[in-house]
Amino acid sequence: MPLINLRTNVSDAQGSDALLKELSAALASSTGKPESYVMTLLDFGVPMTFAGSNDPCAYVEIKSIGVLTPPEMSDRFCELIKASLGIPKDRIYIGFDDVSASHWGWNGRTFG
């Protein structure tokens, strides 16, 4: 049930499959949830600005049922994105959403 959605104005990069897998493994590790439940989304070339500039930037959404640790996860995912895409950490926003189990559907039902 953990989900990470990364949107960036950076053009499609070589190694996007590797980045998806890195994000998936990092999210599973950060939440303690099985990677078999993790979903990753990666959207390149999104028209976006940060601080009035269209220099490389990113917006990340992380959603899960409980077990979010925003301070640690913010550092971890900013470092991963900086290393993979070269986006400075001060040009990345991350939104965290602790979703109620009754509001997360999968396999024709909800988790709660």
Which functions belong to the PLM regions below?
Residues M1-G112:
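Interaction-mediating elements
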